[in-house]
């Protein structure tokens, strides 16, 4: 059989089975604070749920309002729903940029606790504008 993909050598397979797992502390050392610990998750949605759960424990009002763009994978919200976060879907335009005027109007009715910024298809969101929105509505970004 001819493949276009390079096949591993037997030594690569043996090393993969017998090698020790990487040191998680060493892997995270370059980006975590000196006195901080790193927590590893297998899915980004579990991270969102952990953040929501932690923040919900520290605030008095409930439920936690987690703002997510209205074009977002539903499967990624399952863990957030399980921890009791209230999902508020904020409007984005055809250019996949938040409609900031409508977001400001929505925030007057229901202030966000967490605002999830999404970089669609490799295009970075205007994070300065997102930070401005979050600062004016006392939300985490």
Per-segment meaning from a language model:
Residues 48-49, 74-77, 124-127:
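Short, well-ordered alpha-helical microsegments
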Residues 50-53, 78, 119, 132:
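Residue-level signal for well-ordered alpha-helical scaffold segments within enzymatic catalytic domains
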Residues 42-43, 71-72, 121-122:
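Short beta->alpha linker loops
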Residues 94-141:
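Active-site phosphate-binding strand-loop segment of PLP-dependent enzymes
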Residues 1-61, 83:
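Conserved PLP-binding active-site segment in aminotransferase class I/II-type PLP enzymes
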Residues 38, 87, 141:
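Hydrophobic anchor at the start of a short beta-strand
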Residues 52-110:
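Conserved PLP-anchoring active-site segment centered on the Schiff-base-forming lysine
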């Amino acid at each position: 059989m001819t493949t276009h993909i390079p096949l591993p050598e037997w030594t690569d397979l043996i090393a993969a089975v017998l090698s020790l797992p990487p040191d998680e502390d060493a892997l995270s050392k370059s980006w975590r604070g000196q006195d901080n610990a790193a927590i590893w998750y297998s899915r980004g949605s579990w991270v969102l749920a952990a953040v929501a759960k932690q923040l919900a424990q520290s605030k008095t009002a409930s439920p936690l309002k987690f703002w997510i763009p209205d074009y977002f994978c539903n499967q990624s919200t399952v863990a957030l729903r399980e921890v009791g976060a209230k999902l508020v879907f904020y409007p984005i335009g055809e250019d996949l940029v938040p409609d900031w005027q409508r977001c400001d109007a929505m925030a007057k009715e229901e202030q966000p606790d967490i605002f999830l910024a999404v970089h669609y298809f490799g295009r970075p969101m205007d994070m300065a504008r997102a930070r401005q929105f979050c600062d004016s509505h006392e939300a985490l970004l």
